[in-house]
Amino acid sequence: MRRLTVRLFTAVLAALALLTMGTPAHATAPASPSVTFTNPLAEKRADPHIFKHTDGYYYFTATVPEYDRIVLRRATTLQGLATAPETTIWTKHASGVMGAHIWAPEIHFIDGKWYVYFAAGSTSDVWAIRMYVLESGAANPLTGSWTEKGQIATPVSSFSLDATTFVVNGVRHLAWAQRNPAEDNNTSLFIAKMANPWTISGTPTEISQPTLSWETVGYKVNEGPAVIQHGGKVFLTYSASATDANYCLGMLSASASADLLNAASWTKSSQPVFKTSEATGQYGPGHNSFTVSEDGKSDILVYHDRNYKDISGDPLNDPNRRTRLQKVYWNADGTPNFGIPVADGVTPVRFSSYNYPDRYIRHWDFRARIEANVTNLADSQFRVVTGLAGSGTISLESANYPGYYLRHKNYEVWVEKNDGSSAFKNDASFSRRAGLADSADGIAFESYNYPGRYLRHYENLLRIQPVSTALDRQDATFYAE
């Protein structure tokens, strides 16, 4: 009897182990739910910088094509900046320094005051570009007065621009781009600690110079540094090459506990992390900044680009760089993934599986499936658009294949080009439902032309099938991220 009891107990343990191994985790709502925007946010606004303040407002400044003034607008939402009234807070000098090429303003709130960092040339030499700072003690920087704090002095007086400031472990730093007379290039990247918001302290360190092929097209440029911190790491993006379709983002990374003034602490990406996309019609994305969503749960990439490739004349004289927004995603290794500059219009989202929370809907050889660690981000991004079949439906358009949609065929789900037929429109349309396994936060997609069949994963492949069991409902529930 004792031997039988032991055998029975062992069998039960084995069965429980098998069940545990075969049962996926049940997800909770994602820590970073979806956010969407409509691009472009602002026409003819380059080098954009958006700062979210504790007063509930976003503050937005950028280079204007006339290069003659600093403008500012604010709104309580990011999308609201598109229509917010714009105020000129400072105008170039009629003569002397700060009299030409007013470029790349950034607004920061430091120790109870507002500061704007910008670059400017002189009326006697428009290319004598240096970095300058404005200060305001007003609660509302759009209506307050501004004081010129003067030039940010550097040990070497040379072409310098694109100052940005950030704090790591309680220490404020300044990063910027500057011509190093000892090098055969246009600008390199430097970093220093700050004694106050308009003065650097100690000896600056050069942390990057343009040496890679994609950094030296047209001009040899590293410029426009911007910093985002995540998971104990500091990521510094920068722009490279000429300001045409070759403009792109590179990235330096360092541990937040490292000595950031030691050039060896920084590792450079071997390839651009964000560049032109012919597929989406976006050219020369760059000179970015970072902000956060209204709920503080998503990091947002702010940048400019053009929607055409060929420029007549000097790109510097082309006024049509536009400010754009899109969400930053994070890879499993903790590095940021910017994907591609998405098409104009509504921005795409990702859909994670309810019961396999690390897996996302993506296409591979145009077959739709769920998969983890999708480093080619755009394969897992879809625009939620008005359904091709109408009648209150939605369709899911591929981010990197505009005009291609998730559609079912023989109950299998593929990403295919819209051929304009009624059959395609019906197959590519879904009714958006509350999640079948999580009605509060989840989403389910019911086939338009096969009511009762839902988009679900089965052996990692997407299909449309009826749902009846608890497992069916889990497989047919997703979260938008």
Curated annotation (Swiss-Prot):
Residues 349-479 are annotated as: ABD. Residues 37-336 are annotated as: Catalytic. InterPro entries: AbfB_ABD, AbfB_ABD_sf, Glyco_hydro_43, Glyco_hydro_beta-prop_sf. This is Extracellular exo-alpha-(1->5)-L-arabinofuranosidase. Keywords: Carbohydrate metabolism, Glycosidase, Hydrolase, Secreted, Signal. It holds the Pfam family AbfB. The record marks 162 as: Important for catalytic activity, responsible for pKa modulation of the active site Glu and correct orientation of both the proton donor and substrate. It is an enzyme of class 3 (hydrolase). Its EC number is 3.2.1.55. Pathway: Glycan metabolism; L-arabinan degradation. Organized into two domains: an N-terminal catalytic domain and a C-terminal arabinose-binding domain (ABD). Belongs to the glycosyl hydrolase 43 family. Optimum pH is 6.0. Stable from pH 5.0 to pH 6.5. The keyword Hydrolase applies. It is found in: Secreted. The gene is Araf43A. CDD domains: beta-trefoil_ABD_ABFB, GH43f_LbAraf43-like. The lineage of its organism: Bacteria, Bacillati, Actinomycetota, Actinomycetes, Kitasatosporales.
